[in-house]
């Protein structure tokens, strides 16, 4: 283009300066027409600076070529994102019409074309328009992936699982090779998706779950995603990645999420201070699979602010989450045994308070423990390491033991154990106090019974007196009536007689 015709200078995000003809570019761009106004016909060069142009200089050049080519441009998957965003910014309606028409065919694009467009979306500054375009592209990408997996000869993810019958019962080299090929067919897309930003990966995962994609494959991808991305991510990015992983794992089938992997995520999460909501979800997931955990899994170091050697509160929360769910007797016994091992491990911790130690002992129901041997040894170790424990605190710990669940050797050891002598004396005193209190209550109850009996007799006596009074009143009334009759008869028969009968009743 001739230099004399280039009367408009455009600075694109400080990356590049492009010289254009004002009349040509303004004929198509509504944005530049508004900016330049009447100056389009004036003499002299003008300069426009764009600091937030979507897609940068490359995107601007796409639109410029359209303007200089009499409104013609080849819109294709490789340039549609930049063209669409630039046309939206520059208000070039003719380009927008062509890009929107092109995007109507997204579902027919090849996988690499859709993935390329998504990569271009993350290069453009975020806006509602870009987000909407990315959502359409991501929906198409997930749809293609689902169709590809369904059409695969080994589409069922469980068939390639190490826990499946295919893997369990076929250990020869041929079947192992078959398993590897199956795994590759189902996970080929892992590295390709990892080129996307964490925000787009999160969108991808939500759509995968929504479409009920194989949970085992999603789980494998999540742990692979964490492993690869953590190598170069900042602390903030790591936190974001972990939160996305946890939010996705908690909606997957529990059987598809290995317990060991959850503990690996936990150790990372504790070091990154992820948000409380995600941490709670992770703790509940681990709690639901606590019967599959090992002692090493539970021996998590205490946070730096705490003086404890191990994170006891964390184990308390795990166990609570386990007990809140419906569990079989076998699972409960496994967890009970695991907690007893943990108690023995943390008992020597000099900073572990008696109340916290007692909480651990009483954490699982007593019915889950067939023996109290491990608990007794743990209590003995605890009292050995905590010489300042009061007799009352010791008594609370000893009372958790069921002597029926102790061996004869342990019972004999208790009777000889110097640490328990003061406890026995205190226990006897408390039993005496309880007996005295029970005797007082018995006396009070007896006194109440005696008082109640006397009151009953008095009541009967009063009722008898009232009955006799009523009988006398009726007899008196009857006699008065009879006297009235006698008086009337005596007046009529003996007229001259002044003698009256004595008054019997008034």
UniProtKB/Swiss-Prot annotation:
<keyword id="KW-0175">Coiled coil</keyword>
<comment type="pathway">
    <text>Protein modification; protein ubiquitination.</text>
</comment>
<feature type="region of interest" description="Disordered">
    <location>
        <begin position="485"/>
        <end position="506"/>
    </location>
</feature>
<protein>
    <recommendedName>
        <fullName>BTB/POZ domain-containing protein At3g22104</fullName>
    </recommendedName>
</protein>
<feature type="coiled-coil region">
    <location>
        <begin position="421"/>
        <end position="492"/>
    </location>
</feature>
<dbReference type="InterPro" id="IPR000210">
    <property type="entry name" value="BTB/POZ_dom"/>
</dbReference>
<dbReference type="InterPro" id="IPR027356">
    <property type="entry name" value="NPH3_dom"/>
</dbReference>
<dbReference type="InterPro" id="IPR011333">
    <property type="entry name" value="SKP1/BTB/POZ_sf"/>
</dbReference>
<comment type="similarity">
    <text>Belongs to the NPH3 family.</text>
</comment>
<keyword id="KW-0833">Ubl conjugation pathway</keyword>
<comment type="function">
    <text>May act as a substrate-specific adapter of an E3 ubiquitin-protein ligase complex (CUL3-RBX1-BTB) which mediates the ubiquitination and subsequent proteasomal degradation of target proteins.</text>
</comment>
<dbReference type="Pfam" id="PF03000">
    <property type="entry name" value="NPH3"/>
</dbReference>
<feature type="domain" description="BTB">
    <location>
        <begin position="6"/>
        <end position="76"/>
    </location>
</feature>
<dbReference type="InterPro" id="IPR043454">
    <property type="entry name" value="NPH3/RPT2-like"/>
</dbReference>
<dbReference type="GO" id="GO:0016567">
    <property type="term" value="P:protein ubiquitination"/>
</dbReference>
<feature type="domain" description="NPH3">
    <location>
        <begin position="187"/>
        <end position="435"/>
    </location>
</feature>
